[in-house]
Amino acid sequence: MTTAPPAPDVATEPTQRARARLNWPLVLIAGYMAPVGLQAALLPRSFFDSFPVGRGWIAAAGGAYNEHLARDVGVLFVSLVIATAWTATTRAGDRAVAAAWIVQGVAHLAFHAAHLHDLPGGDQVALIATLAVVPVLAAAALRSPTSRPARP
């Protein structure tokens, strides 16, 4: 006597399919960059003086505090995070968003790599490592199966 296969769990099947369609590297970029953008947009002086977590990397790089610039950078990051979260879940334009993060991330990394002299050695390593996260994840997003067009 053969038994019928178990009925699919209709409650979890759509959720599992939705998770499989997510471009996970883009989800990670959105989660990684949201706090950065929110702090710069909402608390620009704190962002300038103490980012990240009290280390003061931005202030140490020199230059005068500029509230307008800090808020604009924060809102720009929040805007990119929204576009990233949208595309990670809809798959619409994920390659373009990943490419945008690569351009931003590599340029940001290159600038800071050329201006490490005001930071202690441990902070230099930490800065380069944390700045490398976004372009590495963005490159992974380009290679994600969800970023490729479906084959007929």
Describe each region flagged by the PLM.
Residues 73-81, 131-134:
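Core segments of transmembrane alpha-helices
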Residues 25-28, 69-75, 100-103:
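Physicochemical signature of membrane-embedded alpha-helices that form the seven-helix bundle of GPCRs
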